[in-house]
Design a protein with these regions (language model features):
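Conserved beta-strand signature within the Rossmann-like core of class I S-adenosyl-L-methionine
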Residues: 134, 160-164, 180-201
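Aromatic/hydrophobic pocket-lining residues that form the small-molecule binding cavity
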Residues: 64, 177, 181
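Active-site glycine- and acidic-residue-rich loops that bind
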Residues: 137-144, 169-178
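Short catalytic/ligand-binding loop motif for oxyanion handling, primarily in non-cytosolic enzymes
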Residues: 88-89, 170-171, 203-205
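Class I (Rossmann-like) S-adenosyl-L-methionine-dependent methyltransferase catalytic domain
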Residues: 117, 138, 195-211
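Rossmann-like AdoMet
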Residues: 1-136, 140-156, 185-186, 197
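Active-site rim beta-loop-alpha module in soluble metabolic enzymes
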Residues: 167, 191, 208
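Short SAM/SAH-binding signature in class I
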Residues: 154-169
């Protein structure tokens, strides 16, 4: 089990399957099964416009886990994974606990179905470590920082690995997600690290033409 506490129920909107959701589209592009026809259609449309996007979820996942391994090897044993998405074959706490069995992780995501699937399917923690899930949005950093789940799971006086990986490009600039990240970084103790990946149009060309 993660902490031995019963999971809090999370209700999904009644029409959740009528509109594509970024977490489900990302899951589809990454070869997952936690998606619906509307998400697959959206994903196919994106790949048709930007063929290189097809491999992006796998690449960013590889990057994030490599970064977690490096941080854990360097002594970081606490991780705040924001925009965690649906559980993958190997998750942040599993990667970290292979190096340090005491590692702790808080997963954060705004998508209701991610919360349900994470609590139901995520692999158990080592007895010495722990993981928890917090339903929250990167754009509301104070809710994350002030959450009892975060404070009960992580020691905010010790270095933390902050992982807003592959999430900023999903938010409009008008919401100023970069300011939310700055707010989170300022709140972290000395010795903390941030692992960040971001889509760029540099490699997302329309096909393989010369434009």
């Amino acid at each position: 089990m993660n902490s031995g506490k019963p999971p809090a129920p999370v209700a999904a909107p009644e029409d959740f399957w009528r509109q594509p959701a970024s977490a489900r589209v990302w899951d589809y592009l990454g070869g997952g099964k936690d998606n619906f026809a509307v998400d697959r259609a959206a994903g196919d449309a994106l790949v048709a416009a930007f063929p290189n996007l097809a491999n992006t979820p796998r690449t960013t996942r590889w990057f994030a886990h490599r970064a977690v391994r490096l941080l854990a090897s360097d002594g970081i044993d606490q991780f705040l994974d924001i925009g965690s998405g649906f559980p993958a074959l190997e998750t942040t706490h599993e990667t970290a606990q292979k190096i340090n069995i005491h590692a702790r992780t808080v997963y954060v995501d705004r998508e209701p179905l991610v919360a349900v699937h994470t609590r139901a399917l995520l692999a158990e923690s080592t007895p010495e470590g722990r993981w928890e899930f917090l339903p929250a949005d990167l754009r509301d950093p104070d809710t994350i920082l002030n959450s009892p789940i975060v404070h009960d799971t992580l020691d905010l006086d010790r270095p933390i690995g902050l992982l807003p990986s592959a999430v900023l490009h999903d938010l409009p600039d008008t919401d100023e997600p970069h300011q939310a990240v700055k707010h989170l970084v300022r709140a972290l103790p000395p010795g903390s690290h941030i692992v960040l990946s971001h889509l760029t149009t540099d490699q997302l060309s329309h096909g393989d033409d010369d434009s």
